[in-house]
């Protein structure tokens, strides 16, 4: 894991114990093939909770004009699997993932779900080793660009702003997942022949998150 050590130290001034760091990169398919080897699922569980809390608190403090629904949509955009996996890809973390043979052949190191879980596991590892303050700083460093993008959406509702930019009638497709008592809504919208996704606890939140994703892409291209 020497490459990961160097990456964390160079970009985040962060060091982790070798054993804990390795565990953060062990997918369950690898541990299944290698006996009692511990995988990263518990760290991912913890990291997911830390990520959600840090982003929620940051948005609450810095976006006083946002309603509860807008806060939820912004958080959904930032912590979505797609967004977190994108950050992991930019850091080239997939190459360090320890996967089982089958998962590796299936291209696991490039899968959105596995990359998102990996980054959340890394957040969990920082939490375990160094506590909440260090984990918070790590999260804010990871998602800082996406937080900046969200801050630029405050003048207009993201769906309205996207409509103005594209000057087209946008159609949002929404699907639901999960049991009735715990529904998750996933929305998608096509802009310039590319599909953007978002999710939330309501149709509106999911649509706003999808609009935020599209806006972020459009504004990155124009900058």
Swiss-Prot record:
EC number: 3.1.26.3
Cofactors: Mg(2+)
UniProt keyword list: Cytoplasm, Endonuclease, Hydrolase, Magnesium, Metal-binding, mRNA processing, Nuclease, RNA-binding, rRNA processing, rRNA-binding, tRNA processing
Residue stretches making up the RNase III domain: 1-131
Primary localization: cytoplasm
Subcellular location, record wording: Cytoplasm
Functional note: Digests double-stranded RNA. Involved in the processing of primary rRNA transcript to yield the immediate precursors to the large and small rRNAs (23S and 16S). Processes some mRNAs, and tRNAs when they are encoded in the rRNA operon. Processes pre-crRNA and tracrRNA of type II CRISPR loci if present in the organism.
UniProt protein name: Ribonuclease 3
Species for this entry: Tropheryma whipplei (strain Twist)
